């Protein structure tokens, strides 16, 4: 797939991003990425066995045990601001 100025402008609009640096450099980088993905698509993987886990026989299961935990309190203790059981963050949407 050839990436040109027109396609880059369309991608910029669709992604709601603004590319302000050297556009030629950006086009070259995107072209390299697309070419690499196209090479990956050329690989014949039909003869390969599907791998769900790297551990033979799958991951060992563990028994679910009910334990008392203060994870919420421990996490909130690290927060700069908290209120009851919630993080307090600056308002970003008006």
From Swiss-Prot:
Heterotrimer of A, B and C subunits. The keyword Transferase does not apply. It catalyses: L-glutamyl-tRNA(Gln) + L-glutamine + ATP + H2O = L-glutaminyl-tRNA(Gln) + L-glutamate + ADP + phosphate + H(+); L-aspartyl-tRNA(Asn) + L-glutamine + ATP + H2O = L-asparaginyl-tRNA(Asn) + L-glutamate + ADP + phosphate + 2 H(+). Allows the formation of correctly charged Asn-tRNA(Asn) or Gln-tRNA(Gln) through the transamidation of misacylated Asp-tRNA(Asn) or Glu-tRNA(Gln) in organisms which lack either or both of asparaginyl-tRNA or glutaminyl-tRNA synthetases. The reaction takes place in the presence of glutamine and ATP through an activated phospho-Asp-tRNA(Asn) or phospho-Glu-tRNA(Gln). It is an enzyme of class 6 (ligase). Keywords: ATP-binding, Ligase, Nucleotide-binding, Protein biosynthesis. This is Glutamyl-tRNA(Gln) amidotransferase subunit C. Gene3D superfamilies: Glu-tRNAGln amidotransferase C subunit, N-terminal domain. The keyword Metal-binding does not apply. GO terms for molecular function: asparaginyl-tRNA synthase (glutamine-hydrolyzing) activity; ATP binding; glutaminyl-tRNA synthase (glutamine-hydrolyzing) activity. Its EC number is 6.3.5.-. Belongs to the GatC family. PANTHER family: GLUTAMYL-TRNA(GLN) AMIDOTRANSFERASE SUBUNIT C, MITOCHONDRIAL. The gene is gatC. One of its GO terms (biological process) is glutaminyl-tRNAGln biosynthesis via transamidation. It holds the Pfam family GatC. InterPro entries: Asp/Glu-ADT_sf_sub_c, GatC.
């Amino acid at each position: 797939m050839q990436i040109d100025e027109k396609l880059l402008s369309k991608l910029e609009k669709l992604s709601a991003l603004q590319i302000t640096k050297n556009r030629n450099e950006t086009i070259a980088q995107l072209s390299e990425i697309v070419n690499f993905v196209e090479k990956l698509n050329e690989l014949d993987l039909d003869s390969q066995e599907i791998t769900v886990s790297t551990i033979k026989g799958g991951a060992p299961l563990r028994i679910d045990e009910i334990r008392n935990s203060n994870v919420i309190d421990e996490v909130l203790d690290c927060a700069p601001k908290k209120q009851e059981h919630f993080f307090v963050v600056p308002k970003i949407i008006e």
